[in-house]
Amino acid sequence: GIPCGESCVWIPCISAALGCSCKNKVCYRN
């Protein structure tokens, strides 16, 4: 539930390496 400061509209979350996932076109962690 914490925004990672990254969007994932066109590309995947680069911050996925930090445990972030795409939700509602924004990368979140927990």
UniProtKB/Swiss-Prot annotation:
GO process terms (BP): defense response to bacterium
Record note on domains: The presence of a 'disulfide through disulfide knot' structurally defines this protein as a knottin.
Name of the molecule in the record: Circulin-A
Stated role: Probably participates in a plant defense mechanism. Has antibiotic activity. Inhibits the cytopathic effects and replication of the human immunodeficiency virus. Active against the Gram-positive S.aureus with a minimum inhibition concentration of approximately 0.2 microM. Relatively ineffective against Gram-negative bacteria such as E.coli and P.aeruginosa.
Modification note: This is a cyclic peptide.
Family: Belongs to the cyclotide family. Bracelet subfamily.
Positions of transmembrane segments: none
Short name of one Pfam family: Cyclotide
Per UniProt, location of the Cyclopeptide (Gly-Asn) cross-link in this chain: 1-30
Keyword annotations of the record: Antibiotic, Antimicrobial, Disulfide bond, Knottin, Plant defense
Disulfide bond sites: 4-20, 8-22, 13-27
